[in-house]
Amino acid sequence: PAVRVVNPHSGEEIARLDGIARAHDVPLLIDGAYGMPFPNIVFTDAVPTWNENIVLGLSLSKLGLPSARTGIIVASEEVIGALGSANAIMSLATGTFGQLMAEPLIRSGELLSLSDDIIRPFYLEKSRRTLEWIDELFADDVEYSVHESEGAFFLWMWFKNLPITTYELYRRLKERNVIVVPGTYFFFGMKEAWSHSDECIRLNYAMPDKEVRRGLEIIAEEAKKAVSEGAVRSSR
């Protein structure tokens, strides 16, 4: 479970999860939309893992082809047969645009070089710049941490001293045309309340640099404003 910012699992972790799945006679499902072997938007030394008990989901969306709506499943022949039959029933006529584009790239190996040499470096640099801007823009009186950036298009920020919830911060940011995802949506199924779930946001840095920086400026302004409002209330 790592949907918040994409936390690439090591081979050891996958092996452990696979062992647990096998012990309960269920397949291990891996969502590899950002991972290996493509689009490889992974900034760690993770390695691709697959065996007959793993159902690996991949996508063309993060290669810049979201409208192709093409998902790729790597699984045993038995699982692929069942999925193919289900898909034939659920989708009367599935599009083939994505398949026609992807097949020659896969056969030639260009898909891997495109991922390794263009896509991964591009987003790694965008992540680095975004982290630098956060350090530059956020005031010292706004206490925050940023989860280690390990891949994908997102950063996870934790505000430690905001007097408002990050849902309220989201509402204020929306009024200024900045959209973030409040952290509360990522803590579903918990039996007990946890304040941390109301202290975090997820940011997307995939947009043009100018827009990303301006969005961060507005987030920093609203966070500082909220902290200042809280300080005023506390002094009364």
Where are these regions (language model features)?
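Conserved glycine-rich beta-strand-loop-beta hairpin in the small C-terminal domain of fold type I
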Residues: D117-L131, E143-F159, H196
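PLP-dependent enzyme catalytic core of the Aspartate aminotransferase-like
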Residues: E175-R176, M190-R236
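Active-site PLP attachment segment
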Residues: P37, D45-S85, A93-G98, V212-G215
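Conserved C-terminal alpha-helix-loop-beta "cap" of PLP-dependent enzymes
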Residues: F154-I201, R214
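Structural signature of PLP-dependent enzymes
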Residues: G84-M90, S108-E132, L162
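Active-site phosphate-binding strand-loop segment of PLP-dependent enzymes
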Residues: P1-P39
